[in-house]
A protein has these predicted regions:
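Short, conserved beta-strand element in jelly-roll/cupin
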Residues: 44-46, 56-71
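Short histidine-centered beta-strand/loop micro-motifs
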Residues: 24, 31-32, 43-44, 51-56, ...
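Ligand-binding loop in jelly-roll beta-barrel domains
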Residues: 90-114
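A short, N-terminal "cap"/entry segment at the start of jelly-roll beta-barrel domains
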Residues: 1-37, 120-127
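A cytosolic small-molecule/anion-sensing beta-strand core signal
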Residues: 65-66, 81-82, 100
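Structural motif
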Residues: 61, 68-70, 77, 93, ...
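Short acidic-glycine-tyrosine-enriched beta hairpin
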Residues: 75-90
Length: 127
């Protein structure tokens, strides 16, 4: 396992396997890395996991690495499968369900303060 390090100019190298998984519910775990103006999260959802409707000021890009997520956005259903990307503008309400065991990368600009300070109660629970 490689160790995280920062260069003299501030570039950060952080292997995922050095970041502890944060369990949010029995069906949802995550890890994240925060830069100055951006954040990337590795999210692991078990089949049936529901991310309740919410919105945030952060622009979001979700890239599904494996599995599939069903999103409800603006009255539409969008299924995002492995290798596919969904861009969600700032303040747009959205909800998701894992159709199968899924791993995705979520990128946020700016970083999610509620995730960093653990006030993201909508994610913490049984589903």
């Amino acid at each position: 396992m490689s160790e995280p390090r920062t260069t003299s100019q501030g570039a950060k190298y952080i292997p995922w396997d050095t970041i502890p998984l944060e369990p949010l519910s029995p069906l949802l775990d995550r890890q994240f890395v925060v830069g100055d103006n951006i954040m990337v999260a590795r999210v692991l959802l078990k089949k049936g996991c529901i991310v309740p409707e919410h919105h945030h000021v952060n622009e979001q890009v979700t890239y599904v690495l494996s599995g599939a997520l069903k999103f409800w956005i603006d009255g539409e259903v969008i299924v995002v499968g492995a290798g596919e990307v969904l861009c969600i503008p700032s303040n747009l309400p959205h909800q998701a369900e894992a159709l199968e065991d899924t791993v995705d990368l979520d990128v946020f600009n700016p970083p999610r303060a509620d995730w960093i300070n653990k006030t993201d109660d909508y994610l913490r629970g049984e589903k």
